[in-house]
Regions:
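A solvent-exposed, acidic/Ser-Thr-rich amphipathic alpha-helical stretch
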Residues: 51, 64-126
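Short beta-strand edge/turn micro-motifs at domain boundaries
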Residues: 32, 121, 141-171
Length: 173
């Protein structure tokens, strides 16, 4: 395997686990223990799945407008290197992160989705395959810890905290 490019190494280095917890009775804190079942109306849980499916499809399509449309105006994104706050800064960061990738694939599986009124939390496992313009590839399995808000009748991402479960990188063989 070839050495990672600087950009890939930078991306990996910032994906350390970090989560900020907002006040709520929902159970998505780091102290979350055992109660990983789905809670709340099925229609809301389905709408949140569709929100994250839209997010992942936009990653695959590298469609910045579709991707950022999933976020609340005051959303927060944390890849382990600190909070990125507000849609403008989140989009700017995403464009920088995505710039070296020719192809991306992202697929997610919810561990649980819990809804309480107009707030929700979920944890997701993701499988990500990335191909750089250089031809090098990277595979990552990650975990998102999310918070959502219903805003004007639609679910939006309020906060996403990402951590890497494992990653591999190298040249296509």
């Amino acid at each position: 395997m070839k050495t990672l490019t600087f950009t890939s190494a930078l991306l990996i280095s910032i994906t350390l686990s970090s989560i900020g917890v907002m006040g709520s009775n929902l159970a998505a804190s780091e102290n979350h223990s055992g109660s990983q079942g789905n809670v709340g109306p099925v229609a809301d849980r389905l709408a949140i799945r569709e929100l994250i499916e839209s997010y992942m499809a936009a990653v695959i399509e590298q469609d910045a407008d579709k991707w950022i449309a999933n976020w609340a105006e005051d959303g927060v994104w944390n890849l382990g290197g600190g909070d990125i706050s507000g849609k403008d800064r989140i989009l700017e960061s995403w464009l920088t992160i995505m710039a070296p990738y020719k192809h991306t694939a992202m697929f997610g599986q919810p561990i649980f989705i819990q809804v309480e009124g107009d707030e929700a939390v979920a944890h997701w496992h993701t499988n990500e395959r990335l191909r750089l313009f250089s031809g090098n590839e990277m595979l990552a399995v990650g975990r998102y810890k999310d918070r959502y808000m219903r805003i004007d009748g639609a679910w939006k991402i309020k906060r996403r905290d990402y951590s890497v479960v494992f990653t591999t990188a190298g040249s296509p063989e």
